[in-house]
């Protein structure tokens, strides 16, 4: 019987569905293990071969853990809200719900074909009201909470209201925005609206004025990673910086916990470092600077207060409220022009771009330690959200300050020199000098001190003179949580007298209403402004913005634990059983977005007692990207003639991308090429050796480069098991690598050879004969190797091990059930269809999914013989096979009396013989 993968995979998948073999429930008799993929956004294009890489790896690990006796939770769902579906709806008039439903059906079909072991009864979609009910519920909990810095915990806002009524807000150690001081009497005398405005400074979900990336063409706020080079990633529309009233989450309150708890996680050090940098903890001081000629001060944060004597100018962020205060009439036009220019640049671009720009405000500040006036400039290399949005510039010891000073011809004063060296003239420098260590100069009472001592003494001086305070600062910002779009979660908020109020929980979910168009209204309101009756029963209007894309993905891993629960996000019992995600697989692009927000969300729920662990993802593995392998044809200019790759240098040619699906091993199928596009119907070709050979390059998979490979096509030609094995065979999971079908035939031939171990022309060839020592050695070597590979995520090295084992068993003409049954189990995580089929054919009870992983026996792995390379004067001349337990003396003697030795000894006695037991013999003549 031949290996008919199409019949096998169709029947096996049908049997799995019928028997519900992947259904999972809490089982206290088994140890739980939760494996999760970062769920996909269901785009209209469907999956290409790069998408399943991480899914296949997690599926192998899930199947392996089941075989090891674990109760494995391995679910899948869809991150279904988002901008792409809405843009498509605007272009076509189709409702996003309809296109999303079609796309998820397509994804499900593709995922099923690959044979994943998902428990589909736990499927979730973020656009399902029964799911986003719990996103809305979590938002309400944040709205009704504040963060107590002293307890390092979220607490009910009602407790804070009681404190205000008792003592006002003096001396409170809580996370808050800009606020005014008030007494208990003043609080009590406030109107409800005034009190609500005060509370907005403390809520974990709050309305605030913030700078955003505003895209007028799309009519919405965009995240930093949705903007590139000043335009939207989707559509290429201009984006500007704009201050807007937005819903925000006070993520910054959790900065220290987010940083500290990284040390408890089994993540790569590079990913942890990315998050550390994003959180950006820095210790320093806040200092007060007075405006010259005005009764006004402003605060700056610095990590190097000791360099205060090197300050030669101040810089404000363009968004700073102080800009209006410090700009003189003489400079107003120049400042306004500059502010308009900077609106077109995102924060991320401002951080990464090294070009120098700025404008003088016309005003001066007073250095609090020297009393000298220093000019105040405005520049976009200072960010409003970090520190106070104002900096003291020390150009001698900061690269960006140095570049700014050089560009605008501002003074540069050196205040730190390497120990034992004199100060030098900054006019001769090419860049700022390092100031992390050294001795202070030009710094008054700090002169002669080490940097470390100067930092400590300056902080003490600032405290004593009441010039500021010591402070820890974080780069991490609060998350902007509203989008002016339709296709997202509605906020469970209504407005009364202009102030937001929480919807009662028993009225959740607040469902998305129908609208006639998915565009902003004529008056500029978000699309929900088009909805009829978008208000409470009492007539109070609902919020018109919707939640951002990361809202639905911030706690989805919890819902998988208990997806049918109507009364809670997750029951206590389900959460205490599964606890956390043991293995999370996804791309590095989520390091500073989703992975920060999910950790924050989980910690908040932990504070409320909803979840039992503070961290959601115990181990995280980032899969690399499968890149496209593009092919090119070479058209002779001004003709429709194409020249083969090896002859292209002889002509003036233009390289053109060609569909990789009409190329095999870089050889173009000319007939299919002519049929591919009308303009190529009459194409002529100049061949080499009767073939048209294409050029190639490694590029991102993209429809525009015609290098997208559909997994359906691979499965139709080779089968899902071949696809699974080949994706793992391409290289280490964490590394990016090119997709290249040139090697897939070898993997498919391996499966045919594997099949032939079990079947011949007469049918099943497996017998109950006892295995030989060599067969046991081959099997147990494989069991050990593959188990270790899976545990270390080295899936690529398992594939050659399978091939070697099958070659050895084929050569041995193995038919023993004692060998071939365990072999099926070991291969089953990688190739589940062929192994399930053969398992059933061998009459083994139950599915191979519920089998037990075989344990290897070290006794079978002991080498009885060792193959020694024998060298003469350092060059290997022959090999000799000897018993593994032979003594060094006997190995030496055996090597010297071997028939091949006489030729190299030439009748001489060896000067020296070196024997490395089990490795090599070297004879010095």
From Swiss-Prot:
Enzymatic reactions: tRNA(Leu) + L-leucine + ATP = L-leucyl-tRNA(Leu) + AMP + diphosphate
Keywords: Aminoacyl-tRNA synthetase, ATP-binding, Cytoplasm, Ligase, Nucleotide-binding, Protein biosynthesis
Entry keyword annotation includes Aminoacyl-tRNA synthetase: yes
Enzyme class: ligase
Motif ('HIGH' region): 40-51
GO process terms (BP): leucyl-tRNA aminoacylation
Top-level taxon of origin: Bacteria
GO molecular function, one term: aminoacyl-tRNA deacylase activity
InterPro entries per record: aa-tRNA-synth_I_CS, Leu-tRNA-ligase, Leu_tRNA-synth_edit, M/V/L/I-tRNA-synth_anticd-bd, Methionyl/Leucyl_tRNA_Synth, Rossmann-like_a/b/a_fold, tRNAsynth_Ia_anticodon-bd, Val/Leu/Ile-tRNA-synth_edit
Keyword Transmembrane set for record: no
Family indicated by similarity: Belongs to the class-I aminoacyl-tRNA synthetase family.
HAMAP family: Leu_tRNA_synth_B (MF_00049_B)
Protein name: Leucine--tRNA ligase
């Amino acid at each position: 019987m031949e290996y008919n993968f199409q019949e096998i995979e169709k029947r096996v998948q049908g049997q799995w569905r019928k028997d519900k073999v992947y259904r999972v429930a809490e089982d206290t008799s088994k140890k739980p293990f939760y494996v999760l993929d970062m769920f996909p956004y269901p785009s209209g294009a469907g999956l290409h071969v790069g998408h399943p890489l991480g899914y296949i790896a997690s599926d192998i690990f899930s199947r392996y853990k089941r075989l090891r006796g674990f109760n494995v939770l391995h679910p899948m769902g869809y991150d279904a809200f988002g901008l792409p579906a809405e843009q498509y709806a605007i272009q076509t008039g189709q409702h996003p719900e309809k296109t999303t439903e079609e796309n998820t059906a397509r994804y499900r079909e593709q995922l099923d074909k690959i044979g994943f072991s998902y428990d589909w009864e736990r499927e979730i979609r973020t656009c399902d009201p029964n799911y986003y009910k719990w996103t809305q519920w979590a938002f309400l909990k944040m709205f009704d909470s504040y963060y107590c810095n002293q307890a390092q915990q979220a607490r009910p806002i009602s407790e804070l209201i009681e404190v205000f009524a008792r003592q006002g807000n003096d001396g409170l150690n809580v996370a808050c925005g800009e606020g005014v001081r008030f007494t208990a009497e003043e609080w009590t005398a406030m109107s409800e609206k005034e009190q609500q405005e005060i509370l907005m400074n403390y809520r974990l979900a709050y309305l605030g004025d913030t700078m955003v990336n505003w895209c007028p063409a799309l009519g919405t706020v965009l995240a930093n990673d949705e903007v590139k080079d000043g335009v939207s990633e989707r559509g290429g529309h201009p984006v500007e910086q704009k201050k807007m009233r937005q819903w925000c989450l006070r993520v910054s309150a959790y900065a220290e916990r987010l940083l500290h708890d990284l040390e408890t996680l089994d993540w790569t050090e590079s990913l942890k470092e990315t998050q550390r940098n994003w959180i950006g903890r820095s210790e320093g001081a806040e200092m007060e600077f007075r405006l010259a000629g005005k009764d006004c001060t402003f605060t700056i944060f610095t990590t190097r207060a000791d360099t205060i004597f090197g300050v030669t100018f101040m810089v404000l962020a363009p968004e700073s409220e102080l800009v209006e205060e410090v700009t003189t009439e003489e400079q107003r036009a120049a400042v306004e022009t500059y502010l308009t220019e900077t609106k077109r640049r995102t924060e991320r671009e401002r951080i990464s771009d090294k070009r120098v720009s700025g404008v003088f405000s016309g005003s001066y500040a007073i250095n609090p330690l020297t009393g000298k006036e220093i000019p105040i400039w405005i520049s976009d290399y200072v960010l409003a959200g970090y520190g106070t949005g104002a900096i003291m510039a020390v150009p001698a010891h900061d690269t960006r300050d140095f570049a700014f000073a050089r560009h605008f011809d501002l003074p540069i004063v050196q205040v730190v020199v390497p120990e034992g060296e004199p100060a030098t003239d900054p006019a001769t420098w090419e860049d700022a000098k390092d100031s992390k260590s050294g001795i202070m100069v030009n710094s008054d009472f700090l002169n002669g001190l080490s940097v470390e001592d100067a930092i400590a003494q300056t902080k003490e001086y600032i405290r004593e003179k009441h010039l500021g305070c010591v402070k820890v600062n974080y780069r991490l910002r609060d998350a902007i949580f509203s989008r002016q779009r339709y296709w997202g979660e509605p906020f469970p908020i209504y407005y009364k007298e202009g102030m937001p109020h929480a919807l009662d929980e028993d009225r959740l979910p607040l469902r998305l209403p129908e609208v006639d168009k998915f565009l902003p209204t004529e008056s500029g309101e978000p699309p929900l402004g088009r909805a009829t009756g978008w208000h409470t029963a009492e007539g109070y209007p609902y919020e018109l913005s919707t939640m951002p894309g990361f809202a639905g993905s911030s706690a989805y891993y919890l819902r998988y634990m208990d997806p049918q629960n109507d009364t809670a996000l997750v029951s206590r019992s389900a959460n205490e059983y599964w606890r956390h995600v043991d293995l999370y697989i996804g791309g590095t692009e989520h390091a500073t977005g989703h992975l920060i927000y999910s950790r924050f969300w989980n910690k908040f729920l932990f504070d409320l007692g909803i979840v039992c662990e503070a961290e959601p993802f115990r181990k995280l593995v980032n899969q690399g990207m499968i890149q496209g392998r593009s092919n090119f044809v070479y058209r002779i200019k001004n003709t429709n003639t194409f020249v083969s790759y090896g002859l292209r240098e002889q002509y003036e040619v233009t390289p053109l991308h060609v569909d990789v699906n009409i190329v095999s091993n870089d050889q173009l199928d000319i007939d299919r090429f002519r049929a591919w596009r009308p303009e190529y119907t009459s194409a002529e070709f100049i061949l080499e050796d009767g073939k048209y050979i294409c050029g190639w390059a490694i590029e991102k998979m993209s429809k525009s480069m015609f290098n997208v490979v559909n997994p359906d096509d691979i499965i139709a030609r080779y089968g899902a098991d071949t696809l699974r094995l080949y994706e793992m065979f391409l290289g280490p999971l964490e590394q990016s690598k090119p997709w290249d079908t040139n090697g897939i035939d070898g993997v498919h031939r391996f499966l045919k050879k594997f099949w032939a171990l079990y079947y011949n022309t007469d049918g099943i060839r497996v017998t109950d004969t006892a295995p030989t020592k060599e067969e046991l050695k081959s099997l147990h070597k494989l069991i050990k190797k593959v188990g270790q590979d899976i545990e270390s995520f080295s899936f690529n090295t398992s594939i050659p091990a399978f091939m070697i084992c099958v070659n050895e068993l084929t050569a041995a003409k193995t038919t023993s059930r004692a060998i071939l049954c365990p072999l099926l189990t070991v291969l089953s995580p990688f190739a589940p269809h062929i192994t399930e089929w053969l398992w059933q054919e061998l009459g083994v009870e139950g599915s191979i999914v519920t089998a037990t992983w075989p344990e290897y026996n070290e006794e079978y792995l002991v080498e009885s013989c060792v193959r020694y390379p024998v060298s003469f004067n350092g060059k290997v001349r022959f090999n000799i096979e000897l018993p593994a337990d032979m003594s060094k003396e006997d190995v030496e003697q055996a090597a010297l009396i071997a028939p091949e030795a006489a030729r190299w000894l030439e009748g001489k006695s060896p000067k020296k013989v070196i024997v490395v037991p089990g490795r090599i013999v070297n004879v010095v003549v």
